[in-house]
């Protein structure tokens, strides 16, 4: 018996990074973690910077970094429209570590004109990229 699947498109302004049938999609929405399975109720929500975990039709898993964007769930399809999307092998771990360090230092040296929200967004993006890299490293080590 074939597993139930739904069509998934993950796109950014620059490219379409994933298109195909999936058994499950996990992303971080503004209200928390979301697990989208075939037959999910229609939904439109904002997604936070983080990891998209895709369980493909054949049971294999793929992890993608999303910098934030929108998730739309329809009866037969899922669409993720993200500002920036990257496969794990496209992430520069050292650059992400440096961005995290800069954001933390900026927050520690906050002045009167400090934009806390912007610093938190930059920190969240860097940490999300590092989580994707760490997840891939763990999967390779298995």
Curated annotation (Swiss-Prot):
One of its GO terms (cellular component) is proton-transporting ATP synthase complex. Belongs to the ATPase epsilon chain family. The keyword Cell membrane applies. This is ATP synthase epsilon chain. Keywords: ATP synthesis, Cell inner membrane, Cell membrane, CF(1), Hydrogen ion transport, Ion transport, Membrane, Transport. It is a peripheral membrane protein. NCBIfam families: ATP_synt_epsi, PRK00571.1-4. Disulfide bonds: none annotated. InterPro entries: ATP_F1_dsu/esu_C_sf (IPR036794), ATP_synth_F1_dsu/esu (IPR001469), ATP_synth_F1_dsu/esu_N (IPR020546), ATP_synth_F1_esu_C (IPR020547), ATPsynth_dsu/esu_N (IPR036771). Pfam families: ATP-synt_DE, ATP-synt_DE_N. One of its GO terms (molecular function) is proton-transporting ATP synthase activity, rotational mechanism. Signal peptide: none annotated. It is found in: Cell inner membrane. Produces ATP from ADP in the presence of a proton gradient across the membrane. F-type ATPases have 2 components, CF(1) - the catalytic core - and CF(0) - the membrane proton channel. CF(1) has five subunits: alpha(3), beta(3), gamma(1), delta(1), epsilon(1). CF(0) has three main subunits: a, b and c.
